[in-house]
Amino acid sequence: MTLGIDEAGRGCLAGSLFVAGVACSEKTALEFLKMGLKDSKKLSQKKRFFLEDKIKTHGEVGFFVVKKSAEAIDSLGLGACLKLAIEEILENGCSLANEIKIDGNTAFGLNKRYPNIQTIIKGDETIAQIAMASVLAKAAKDREMLELHALFKEYGWDKNCGYGTKQHIEAIIKLGATPFHRHSFTLKNRILNPKLLEVEQRLV
């Protein structure tokens, strides 16, 4: 049994970070590969939602999804939020797996406590369980940004999913940041202006 871990929303200017863990056998993983599973970035949103449902309802799959808000990222930092989310997944899913595979190049020092952790660069392209985790994380991020888009249509979140596209950055310059923007990120990019109150009033 392998536990795969991946995230979505790491580089966004808005919305939460989602980290997912999926544990299953190689035999079960093969079923999903036959359904067209691959790195979530290479799947359409419709296909991600389809696979998300199949993963969550499969009797032989264990999964856990952790959300860290923009506010948490601003107060703790992105790296700390990633580490905390991975710890939560390991505490909730580690008993299921004899192998733990994390997408990327860092285990955040957790390999001292969990010696069976492997970090794999582009693991979402080569390890089915990481690709499955990638689907759950990205589908959760998609859903969040579609819901937030209904509140703030000018930022194009239904299309850019919170990433810093030209339209998104231009909207921040023109309208200011929303309470769902990561202010530590927008300040770093010098695109935050003092119009926060104006958009906050829409939430009241």
Swiss-Prot record:
GO terms for biological process: DNA replication, removal of RNA primer; mismatch repair. Manganese or magnesium. Binds 1 divalent metal ion per monomer in the absence of substrate. May bind a second metal ion after substrate binding. It comes from the Bacteria. Its main location: cytoplasm. Its EC number is 3.1.26.4. InterPro entries: RNase_HII, RNase_HII/HIII, RNase_HII/HIII_dom, RNaseH-like_sf, RNaseH_sf. Residues 1-197 form the RNase H type-2 domain. This is Ribonuclease HII.
